[in-house]
Amino acid sequence: MQIKLANPRGFCAGVDRAIEIVNRALDVFGPPIYVRHEVVHNKFVVDNLRQRGAIFVEELDQVPNNVIVIFSAHGVSQAVRKEAEGRGLKVFDATCPLVTKVHMEVVRYSRDGHECVLIGHEGHPEVEGTMGQYDASNGGAIYLVEDEADVAALEVRKPEALHYVTQTTLSMDDTSKVIDALRAKFPQIQGPRKNDICYATQNRQDAVKELADQCDMVLVVGSPNSSNSNRLRELAERMGTPAYLIDGAEDMQRGWFDGVRRIGITAGASAPEVLVRGVIAQLREWGASEEQELEGREENITFSMPKELRVKAL
């Protein structure tokens, strides 16, 4: 068996920053540090931070007074921010800057009294946070659609003042179909100047397509609740290549690889490289040859830390 590795794969700049915010808060202020929602959707990462003293909660009413709370990379609604301010909680915001960009677009549409359509998955924390940026007091509304059927059923009040934004971790192919449906139904709809699907999502989807084209099977390292990891698995399967989403080597079954000559491995944007290395080590034990990394696309984007958590130069 030959192993091929997607490039890029694994952590993106937003995930790196979010995890580092929790780690530095623990270093500077000591445990416990409260985190609203899993800071990123990866079991290994969350378990490690929990062992260091991070306490993960779903709502701020689970957070005591006079503590530090961190908002996850997925972002939060304006209501959550106001609740934290009202209670005087010290907040560090780990929202990915590319999610914040979408939030600012929604706030602008809301302020101007324009309506907005969000393309995304209902119930995902990023979607809840983005929907929660819209203030309907100016007479507009925000609508959520997931697919072309939702667009067909959608009725808006202001088709002449309508915009769309997207969740940052969607499938580019699926999203383009929804956008086409929106434009066909609402010819005056306007989109953002720049695609809302983030660079890391796009790069990893391009890489898994290349991987699936060269392999008999694809393994996607990522947790089941990771949106971008699920999209990678779906993309590989759509290209006709069997694919499995795994948290790590412990999820693999030896029988999966009977008759497989080329195994492709990628990782979602919230999955650390150590898990990929564990998968490779297990495959090598089962007889796989040394891995080959595909050329891919270099990523050198970084996002700054909150001022109080920046490491001072010696």
Swiss-Prot record:
GO molecular function, one term: 4 iron, 4 sulfur cluster binding
Annotated Gene Ontology cellular component terms: cytosol
Binding note for cofactor: Binds 1 [4Fe-4S] cluster per subunit.
Claim: Hydrolase is one of the keywords in the record: no
Binding site for dimethylallyl diphosphate: 41, 74, 124, 226-228, 270
Similarity comment: Belongs to the IspH family.
Cofactor(s), by name: [4Fe-4S] cluster
Domain of life where this protein originates: Bacteria
Gene: ispH
Protein name per the record: 4-hydroxy-3-methylbut-2-enyl diphosphate reductase
Record keywords: 4Fe-4S, Iron, Iron-sulfur, Isoprene biosynthesis, Metal-binding, Oxidoreductase
Binding site residues for isopentenyl diphosphate: 41, 74, 124, 226-228, 270
Pathway involvement of the protein, from the record: Isoprenoid biosynthesis; dimethylallyl diphosphate biosynthesis; dimethylallyl diphosphate from (2E)-4-hydroxy-3-methylbutenyl diphosphate: step 1/1; Isoprenoid biosynthesis; isopentenyl diphosphate biosynthesis via DXP pathway; isopentenyl diphosphate from 1-deoxy-D-xylulose 5-phosphate: step 6/6
Record-listed (2E)-4-hydroxy-3-methylbut-2-enyl diphosphate binding positions: 41, 74, 124, 168, 226-228, 270
Binding site for [4Fe-4S] cluster: 12, 96, 198
Species, as recorded: Pseudomonas aeruginosa (strain ATCC 15692 / DSM 22644 / CIP 104116 / JCM 14847 / LMG 12228 / 1C / PRS 101 / PAO1)
